[in-house]
Amino acid sequence: MRERRDSTRRRFLAAAGAASTTALAGCSSILGGDGGDSSDRPTLADFRGSGEIVSDRPAPGGTSIEDLPDLEGELAVYLGGGEGGRYTTLIDLLNRYYDDFEASAQTQPSSQLANVIVDEHDSGTTQADVFWSVDAGSLAYVADNGATTALSGDTTSMVGDDRFVTEQWAGVAGRSRAVPYNTNQFSASDIPTSVDAIATEDRFAGTLGWAPTYGAFHGFVTAMRQLRGDDGTREWLNAMLDQNPARYDSEYATVSQGITNGEVGLGLTNHYYPILVFASNPDAPLDLAFTENDAGALVNTAGASVLDGAASPDLAELFVRHLLSAEAQEFLATRGFAFPMIDGVEPVGPLPTIDELSPPELDLQSLSDVQPTIELLEDVGILS
């Protein structure tokens, strides 16, 4: 599968440069129509991104919002992260779609909200109905502490891959770790298929960028701990330090500032940051590669769960089903460049499907074991 990815990555990023978040002109019913409805109800055009990257996309498959029961009532959502405001935009679209529905979101980092949820559950003061997290580890932590309720088969069956759903939470938007690189410094054939090579080969010394305070990086290191143990992970981290990597505040900055400006040649980030950079800078000397069968190829997921003690548990689960609707999945795929979680919606452009990636064999729920990762990063001197 690597040959296919190597031949399409540059074409994908070039197409991504034409993408934006403005709406497509056209349909007025949710998945198309003759324009006869003059209401303000959002259409597929409002959910979908625009530009060359989506111009040839067919209507999404899966379960349409029109085929789901109406959302009615008030809902409180604990929103972990929010992906630069995109998740709150999706909530706003659902609020606009239903006259008698109002979801409000309180946004904090997923790990912080997970601790808040468990504390509230233990004290019997649950304040929200839904936990929408950017990572499976936080979802698992909340579930492991008994703070969620089981989802019905109507909800869990909507997720097309068993790796990204449990009885307690459902994945809604997948993401992969990746290796963005500066094409003025490296070609596709220069990028190894292993993060070990990046940490040990002399040709990468002094040309690496990373964001070690970032939650996504902690998830990556946690995955490495699960795969090779603490000692093996410590060895890799020390090898990376020997490469003298440049430090950035976020993975977006690693790409937009470090790699794009040539401060560094490559980095370790989530797959969508290079695409977001291309959306505003289509001439950036930037491309994207994937490692294979190691923590650098980890595929994680944002997801949602219904909280134990929720004031509106039935409405909360119906909201989760709406996040898995054809329209919401199209939104997440074309605006956030995420990997869709339902059958019938494809990733944008020639971005590989999850099945075409080579992630390691790993239970995503093990990513909740983050505290030993923080302690390890502190011990080797990466965090203080």
Give residue spans per PLM region.
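General small-molecule cofactor/ligand-binding pocket signal
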Residues: A103-Q108, R247-Y248, D287-A289
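Extracytoplasmic ligand-binding site segments that recognize negatively charged/polar headgroups
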Residues: G73-A76, G80-T88, Q108-S111, T126-E263
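Mature extracytoplasmic/periplasmic domains
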Residues: A302-L364
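Haloarchaeal acidic low-complexity proteome signature biased toward cell-envelope/secretome components but also
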Residues: M1-S64
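Sec-exported extracytoplasmic/periplasmic mature domains
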Residues: D92-D100, V118, D122, A136, ...
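Extracytoplasmic/periplasmic substrate-binding proteins
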Residues: G232, D249-G309, E346
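Conserved C-terminal helix/tail region of periplasmic/extracytoplasmic solute-binding proteins
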Residues: D363-S384
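Early extracytoplasmic/lumenal segment of secretory-pathway proteins
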Residues: G51-V134, A140
